[in-house]
Every structure is written in C-alpha cells, then in structure tokens.
Amino acid sequence: MIGKINKFNFKSLLVLNTFALIATSYLFNNFIFIGVFILFFFLSLFATKNGLEIIRKLNLLQNIRTEGPSNHFQKSNTPTMGGVFLMIPFFILLLIITINLSSLKLFLLLLTIFGFYITGFLDDYLSIKNKENTGLKTKEKFILQSVISIIFILLAYEKNLINPLVILSDSWVINMNIFILPISFLVLVGISNSVNLTDGLDGLAAGCSGIVFYGLGTEILMKEQQELFVFSILCFSMSGLCLGFLKYNSYPAKIFMGDTGSLSIGATLGTIALLTNSVFTLSIFSGIFIIESLSVIIQVGVFKITKKLFHRGKRIFLMAPLHHHFELKGVKEQKIVENFWKINILLIILGIVLKIKL
C-alpha cells in the first residue's frame, strides 16, 4: 500500500497538472484555460486510441537499435508514429485561430511546426520502411530542420515578430541585436532535437512536454499582454494533448510518438517561446530536455577528443542520452521517468518564482 501511495505515475501527474491549471484559471480569472486543457486531453485520448488501431492495421511498428540497452528489445514492434494523430487536434485549432485572427505570427507558427511535423514523418516512415531505427540520415534531418528554421527566423525578424531584447527583469534587459538570429536558430533546432533525444523511455518526453507547456502558458499569461493571450491557449491545449497521449505512452507503452511527435512538440515550444519573448524562461522549464541533449554532446565530444589524444575513446556516461546511463546503472525505467517528471515540476516552479521575483 505504501509503495502505491509513493508512486508518482500518469494519474498523479494528470491530477497535479489539472489542479495547477484550475489555480491558474482562478488567479487570472478566466476558466477557459482549464476548459481548453480538459477538452484537448479528451481529444488526445480519442485521437490516440483511434490512431493506434490504424497504426496496427498498417503495421507501423518500432524498430529498436541494437546498440541500445538490452531491456529495450522487448519494445520492438510497438506501434509508432503516434505523433501523427497527437498533433491533428492542435493543427485544426491553430488553423481556425489563424484564419479568424488573420495573424502573421500564427501563420508562421503553423508553417514552422508543420515543417518539423513533415520532417519527423519522413524520418519515421523511412525507418519503418527500411526496418531500421533511423530513417533520414542525421545530415538530411539537420538540413531540413535548418531550412525550415531559417525561413521562419528571417521572416519573423523582418516583420519584427522576434524581439531582440531579452528581458530578464524590469531593470535587466539585454539587447541581442543581430545575434538574436543565431540564438533563435539554436533555440528552435536545439529544443526540437532535445525533445527527440528525451523520447527514449516510456512516457518521458510526453510527460515532460505536458509539464513544460503548462509552465510556458502560465509564464506568457504573467506578461499581461492581450495579444499574447492566444499563445497561452495554444500551450494549455498542447499540455492536454501530451498528457492524453501519455495515457497510452506511459509504461508499458502501447504506442510511441516517433519523430513526428517529438520534433513537432519541440518546434512548438521553441517557436512559441521566440514569438512571445519567453526564451529565457523556456531554458529553465526545459532543463530536462537540455540536460538530455548536453549529455549526448558531452559523450560524443569527450570520446572524439580522447580518441584523438590517446588513441582510445573514453566515455563520461555508460550510455547517452542521460536516461540510458541510469538504466545501465540498474535504475528501473519507471523510476527514472518519475524522477525526471518531478525535477521538471521543480523547474517550472523555479522559473515562475524567478519570473515573479525578477
């Protein structure tokens, strides 16, 4: 009984996120936020359940890389490409709002996310077709992401939709000038790939994404800018979609989101943060994603340097990304995911406190 009480699982996260959104709705005197979250949670359940049946009929099954942890081989043949169905309700919402508001910001947001969605779809499709864990080559995927990101950044910068001023507080403002361009590129490509790297354990990326979208939506509300209100709605809808998907993606996963889902989610976070000048706060909220990505960069970098210097590569971690390191240390998959969720919740609290204090 004690073990069950202490377990922090999908239901625990859903209840916590729901109460947090009720509190947010109460504080900002607008219950549309909790309404949007609940609506898209159930839309996600519906889309994922029906999508799962379609995926099984089409035999779209996950291939597991041989160099990964041995306990992952049992995940082979799990239905994948769930992100295809996860994102459909969001695209419909975004398209409707974009048409009604005739907003260039929202139009660029829609095109950018859809570009990453197609990139992920191609990667997933080729992976299944070739019966390998990877579809597009790393360079091919990076080129596609880069082209999409550069088009968005240049158009947004030209129309003054990206603010070069990084506002940390009322008295601490940094003017990035032209350097906002490479920073924006790093944010967009970086966060999308970081979410993709985090999507290696059942429920890890979906759970963390649901948490981060809540934090980002709340932070945008705290800016008290009427024109940004719609972005909070989009964030809370994505939070609901991610947690709805988590119902089927938590351990043991019945479906994976694939690159279609992870790249789309990351692109949504990055693009919204850039358009709402929330990059600094997102960097705190997305601490788990960033650490996962950094663990890969450090692992590869150290290995290459030591191999060149000592003719024998050394590794910092047993395996990267970081969640695999803990797996090989003997920590159970569910426990790793639960702890990462808890850390992410603390990062949301930290980011919001800093927003209030600064």
From Swiss-Prot:
<feature type="transmembrane region" description="Helical">
    <location>
        <begin position="81"/>
        <end position="101"/>
    </location>
</feature>
<dbReference type="InterPro" id="IPR000715">
    <property type="entry name" value="Glycosyl_transferase_4"/>
</dbReference>
<dbReference type="GO" id="GO:0009252">
    <property type="term" value="P:peptidoglycan biosynthetic process"/>
</dbReference>
<comment type="similarity">
    <text>Belongs to the glycosyltransferase 4 family. MraY subfamily.</text>
</comment>
<keyword id="KW-0997">Cell inner membrane</keyword>
<feature type="transmembrane region" description="Helical">
    <location>
        <begin position="336"/>
        <end position="356"/>
    </location>
</feature>
<keyword id="KW-1133">Transmembrane helix</keyword>
<dbReference type="GO" id="GO:0005886">
    <property type="term" value="C:plasma membrane"/>
</dbReference>
<dbReference type="InterPro" id="IPR018480">
    <property type="entry name" value="PNAcMuramoyl-5peptid_Trfase_CS"/>
</dbReference>
<feature type="transmembrane region" description="Helical">
    <location>
        <begin position="278"/>
        <end position="298"/>
    </location>
</feature>
<dbReference type="GO" id="GO:0071555">
    <property type="term" value="P:cell wall organization"/>
</dbReference>
<dbReference type="GO" id="GO:0008963">
    <property type="term" value="F:phospho-N-acetylmuramoyl-pentapeptide-transferase activity"/>
</dbReference>
<feature type="transmembrane region" description="Helical">
    <location>
        <begin position="228"/>
        <end position="248"/>
    </location>
</feature>
<comment type="pathway">
    <text>Cell wall biogenesis; peptidoglycan biosynthesis.</text>
</comment>
<dbReference type="GO" id="GO:0051992">
    <property type="term" value="F:UDP-N-acetylmuramoyl-L-alanyl-D-glutamyl-meso-2,6-diaminopimelyl-D-alanyl-D-alanine:undecaprenyl-phosphate transferase activity"/>
</dbReference>
<dbReference type="Pfam" id="PF10555">
    <property type="entry name" value="MraY_sig1"/>
</dbReference>
<feature type="transmembrane region" description="Helical">
    <location>
        <begin position="201"/>
        <end position="221"/>
    </location>
</feature>
<feature type="transmembrane region" description="Helical">
    <location>
        <begin position="255"/>
        <end position="275"/>
    </location>
</feature>
<comment type="function">
    <text>Catalyzes the initial step of the lipid cycle reactions in the biosynthesis of the cell wall peptidoglycan: transfers peptidoglycan precursor phospho-MurNAc-pentapeptide from UDP-MurNAc-pentapeptide onto the lipid carrier undecaprenyl phosphate, yielding undecaprenyl-pyrophosphoryl-MurNAc-pentapeptide, known as lipid I.</text>
</comment>
<keyword id="KW-0460">Magnesium</keyword>
<keyword id="KW-0133">Cell shape</keyword>
<dbReference type="GO" id="GO:0008360">
    <property type="term" value="P:regulation of cell shape"/>
</dbReference>
<keyword id="KW-1003">Cell membrane</keyword>
<feature type="transmembrane region" description="Helical">
    <location>
        <begin position="27"/>
        <end position="47"/>
    </location>
</feature>
<feature type="transmembrane region" description="Helical">
    <location>
        <begin position="106"/>
        <end position="126"/>
    </location>
</feature>
<feature type="transmembrane region" description="Helical">
    <location>
        <begin position="171"/>
        <end position="191"/>
    </location>
</feature>
<keyword id="KW-0479">Metal-binding</keyword>
<protein>
    <recommendedName>
        <fullName>Phospho-N-acetylmuramoyl-pentapeptide-transferase</fullName>
        <ecNumber>2.7.8.13</ecNumber>
    </recommendedName>
</protein>
<keyword id="KW-0573">Peptidoglycan synthesis</keyword>
<dbReference type="GO" id="GO:0046872">
    <property type="term" value="F:metal ion binding"/>
</dbReference>
<dbReference type="Pfam" id="PF00953">
    <property type="entry name" value="Glycos_transf_4"/>
</dbReference>
<keyword id="KW-0812">Transmembrane</keyword>
<keyword id="KW-0472">Membrane</keyword>
<keyword id="KW-0132">Cell division</keyword>
<feature type="transmembrane region" description="Helical">
    <location>
        <begin position="147"/>
        <end position="167"/>
    </location>
</feature>
<keyword id="KW-0808">Transferase</keyword>
<keyword id="KW-0961">Cell wall biogenesis/degradation</keyword>
<dbReference type="InterPro" id="IPR003524">
    <property type="entry name" value="PNAcMuramoyl-5peptid_Trfase"/>
</dbReference>
<keyword id="KW-0131">Cell cycle</keyword>
<dbReference type="GO" id="GO:0051301">
    <property type="term" value="P:cell division"/>
</dbReference>
